[in-house]
């Protein structure tokens, strides 16, 4: 789904691991990551010893001994109940570093109306395009139109990690970078009371 010119550019870039995990790149990623977050307690705590933390992360990454720390889980109600898994600042910095490398590789494959975490997109453009589509479909409010609000239940909990890794690794030439991504994907594990397990139990209970 990527044009040949872009594939050639991507292969030339090569996702060189040493450049990705370099000190300079990590500090650059930190400046991007901390935007609009500088007053958060966990960000300020990490920044108190910023150089030590970044150098330690770099050393772990370059030696391939990086291990993802446990996620902090908390509950929100907006209005439905959801359990949120939040990584540490150190790990979120590593996530941001990886995001920067993968963004251009996959952005061109997304449909136009995918708005989250994309340059030049976002919720404001999404709302504006919905309003434009409603005006067009309703002939400038001359007729009634309907919109279906829907969501994929437990989407992230149900993602097949093996298939996700296969999709990503097809676009990456550096094996060390691929191993790092696989390690981070594998860091998220569902609890015993996960969606798939509960669905199997429900189907079993409903079976005659």
Predicted segments — roles?
Residues 16, 103-160:
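Active-site-proximal segment of RNA-dependent polymerases
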Residues 25, 57-80, 93, 100, ...:
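Reverse-transcriptase-like RNA-dependent polymerase core
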Residues 42-46, 68-75, 108-115, 142-149, ...:
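Short coil/turn segments at secondary-structure boundaries
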Residues 46, 118-119, 204-208:
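Conserved, non-catalytic sequence blocks in retroelement Pol enzymes and Pol-derived host proteins
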Residues 53, 60-61, 133, 137-208:
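Conserved polymerase palm-domain catalytic core
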Residues 81-111, 198-208:
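Conserved pre-motif C helix in the palm subdomain of viral-like polymerases
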């Amino acid at each position: 789904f990527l044009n040949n010119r872009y594939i050639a550019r991507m292969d030339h870039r090569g996702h060189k691991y040493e450049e990705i995990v370099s000190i300079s790149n990590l500090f650059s990623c930190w400046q991007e990551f901390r935007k609009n977050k500088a007053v958060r307690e966990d960000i300020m705590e990490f920044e108190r010893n910023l150089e030590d933390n970044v150098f330690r992360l770099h050393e772990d990454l370059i030696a391939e001994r990086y291990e993802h720390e446990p996620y902090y889980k908390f509950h929100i109600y907006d209005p439905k109940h959801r359990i949120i898994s939040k990584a540490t600042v150190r790990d979120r910095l590593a996530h941001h570093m990886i995001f920067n490398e993968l963004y251009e590789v996959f952005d061109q494959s997304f449909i136009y109306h995918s708005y989250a975490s994309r340059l030049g997109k976002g919720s404001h453009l999404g709302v504006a395009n919905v309003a434009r589509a409603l005006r067009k479909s309703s002939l400038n409010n001359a007729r009634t139109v309907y919109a279906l609000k829907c969501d994929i239940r437990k989407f992230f909990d149900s993602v097949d990690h093996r298939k996700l890794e296969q999709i990503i690794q097809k676009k990456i030439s550096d094996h060390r970078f691929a191993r790092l991504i696989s390690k981070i994907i594998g860091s998220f594990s569902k609890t015993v009371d996960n969606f798939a397990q509960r669905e199997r139990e429900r189907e079993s209970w409903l079976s005659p």
